[in-house]
Curated annotation (Swiss-Prot):
The keyword ATP-binding applies. Belongs to the YFH7 family. Notoamides have been shown to exhibit antitumoral activities. Notoamides A-C show moderate cytotoxicity against HeLa and L1210 cells with IC(50) values in the range of 22-52 mg/ml, but the IC(50) value of notoamide D is greater than 100 mg/ml. Moreover, notoamide C induces G2/M-cell cycle arrest at a concentration of 6.3 mg/ml. GO terms for molecular function: ATP binding; kinase activity. It comes from Aspergillus versicolor. The keyword Kinase applies. ATP-dependent kinase-like protein; part of the gene cluster that mediates the biosynthesis of notoamide, a fungal indole alkaloid that belongs to a family of natural products containing a characteristic bicyclo[2.2.2]diazaoctane core. The first step of notoamide biosynthesis involves coupling of L-proline and L-tryptophan by the bimodular NRPS notE', to produce cyclo-L-tryptophan-L-proline called brevianamide F. Keywords: ATP-binding, Kinase, Nucleotide-binding, Transferase. InterPro entries: P-loop_NTPase. This is ATP-dependent kinase-like protein notR'. It comes from the Eukaryota. Its EC number is 2.7.1.-.
């Protein structure tokens, strides 16, 4: 779903560009309609003449989506879609979710998420230090997470975000 981030130029053209750029990752900074159209295309009946479907990717080096970068061949029978808003009970995300065979939700403990986000924000250069990362997490990431949890559609499976540790505990 990262390919459906709105390009930085589009965020800069919004009525409040500073907020749009700072909040990148919030629902309103994604092309939800474009994602919905992708899911619709993926649900079309396959025939011998069905074309390859292309989806955008996200290039972290240029910090923008790359159109038509991911090829999904008509022979693909299982397609896994991943992203923050895929189970959000708000249009167009809820319409896209209705077209999916199953929806799974990975729940991550808030402290584990915070630690991972601090590391990611500092390592990727989004912020200069841990204090700035903590501020960004509270003013963007956790707002997004709270919105998703509060407005999530029912899902078929809840996956714990620490499943690796849980799996390892069972092996020991």
């Amino acid at each position: 779903m990262d390919g459906y981030h709105l390009p930085r130029a589009q965020l800069a053209a919004m009525p409040d560009p500073a907020t749009a750029i700072y909040r990148r990752g919030a629902e309103f900074t994604f092309d939800g309609e474009g994602f919905y159209r992708l899911v619709q295309r993926l649900r079309e009946r396959l025939t011998a003449a069905s074309p390859t479907v292309f989806a955008p990717s996200f290039d972290h080096a240029i910090k923008d989506p790359v159109p038509d970068d991911v090829a999904i061949s008509p022979g693909s029978r299982v397609i896994i879609l991943e992203g923050l808003y895929l189970s959000l009970n708000r249009e167009p995300w809820s319409s896209a979710a209705a077209l999916m065979d199953e929806s799974w939700f990975v729940g991550v403990d808030r402290e584990i998420a915070r630690a991972r986000l601090v590391k990611r924000h500092v390592t990727s250069g989004i912020v200069p230090d841990t204090a700035a990362a903590e501020h960004r997490i509270l003013s963007t990431d956790f707002l997004n997470a709270d919105d998703i949890v509060k407005n999530r559609l029912p899902v078929q499976e809840m996956v714990p975000g620490n499943w690796r540790e849980l799996s390892q505990d069972r092996l020991d």
